[in-house]
Amino acid sequence: LFLTRSIEAHVTNSYPVLCRQDGWYNSSTVRELIRQSDQVWVASAWQAWDAALLPESLANLRREFGDKFVIFGTKDFGIIDIKKLLATPVPQRYQTQNQISETSRQINRQLAQAVGTTHFVDVSDLICGASGRGCRVFTPDGRLLSYDGGHLTVEGARELGSSLVDVPAIKNALSF
């Protein structure tokens, strides 16, 4: 977050490192890289409290660096239970779908509303689909998408990368 005030009051005891790392945008190297960039992708494991602060942060970033920021939503591919998956017969295994938490969906809706669809990428929707019915666990060729429900495997990252070219926020940057 690029704020002119401390976020310490918002950070829970489980995230003390955030307070110590607050101010990353004050690095002259980071600021120069942002200035030189045509587009900057901002990704985080967003929580409700920092998603609520994003509009203020984004306004500060735009004022300082211009309108070049694309916000990537929080990722949630459900709970991945490797032992359970391995115990599932192969044909059924590849049909497995997980539920995405309503909290994650709500945070992504909040982010999309705050920044607009031209500056937002809903990663969960790209991987899982916008239906909300569930999120597949495997790629079409049987490779695991995520090993922990929040981080992509190499195969999952490839699949996400191939779908990014059709996202308006990314497509516009690729057309220059």
Where is each model-derived feature located?
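Extracellular glycan-modifying ectodomains
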Residues: L1-F176
